Amino acid sequence: MQAATGASMLNFGYWLGDANNPVDAQTNLCTLVGKLADLRTCRTLIDVGSGYGAPALQWSEEYKLRNIICVNINSQQLLNGFKIASSKIENARVSNAWCLRTNVTYINSSSLCLPFATGTVDRIIALESAQHFKPFDTFIAESYRILQPKGLLVIAMPVTVSLDNVLKKLFNLGILNLTWSSEHYGFEYVKSTISRYQFEIMNVSMIGSQVFEPLALYYTQNRKELRQKIMAYYPSYIEKILWKSLVKMMTVSKKGLIEYVVLKAQKL
């Protein structure tokens, strides 16, 4: 979808209110996660699996955060994120430029070995990235280690529901078994793993109906235009696979077989 939108966000988006395009929906999801993480009182935020760093820049501007660290194993995405931030600095007023220049740091590292001392941060966010972390419990253990007491972990990610064995996943997910780049973690597994590492789950929101279905409908309704944009970078069969995958996501979402969870947990 990035090729279609031309934006630097990498999430499905939260299609609430007047959001009628992917960029607005993606901004909505970042806003939702930022509020849930209570970033107004945050001192040090670690954005794990930060992509191109667009959410971090949004949170920096919204909350005037003192210290945001983008952690990503993909060095090319980090480099592009730094270039995006630098471009914003060049076009910003001096006060905003100072904020962006000094408050966002980029670190090339794995989510399974976070390069921070024990008990040194008060917020960790994984916005649609934790679905890729393997093993998931190692990331949760690392999050617990580096968080201060009462520090917050906020995760936004798609999950499977009631697909508790491989055969069920293969049968029900269909094409998504190949095209949905994810470990396809189950919702109950995610919850139980977080609780097992002495986190208290404080808030859980299931927003799948405002993620998968409106995204698929938007793509279907605007497919002709989006297809041309995508085919400027990829062969036509890639676009066809993308469209079929989005429609399949909408179908299994309506059946209650996948969800999108936004979860906040506090270190005990």
Describe every region a protein language model picked out.
Residues 44-113:
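Class I SAM-dependent methyltransferase SAM/SAH-binding core
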Residues 159-181:
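Short, glycine-/aromatic-enriched active-site segment of Class I SAM-dependent methyltransferases
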Residues 112-124:
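A short acidic, Gly/Pro-enriched loop at the edge of an enzyme's catalytic core
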Residues 205-268:
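Conserved Class I S-adenosyl-L-methionine
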Residues 24-43:
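Conserved alpha-helix/loop element of class I SAM-dependent methyltransferases that forms part
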Residues 182-198:
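Short alpha-helix
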Residues 155-157:
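Acidic carboxylate diad motif detector
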Residues 137-152:
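A short glycine-rich, Lys/Arg-flanked "PGG" loop and its adjoining helix->strand segment in the class I
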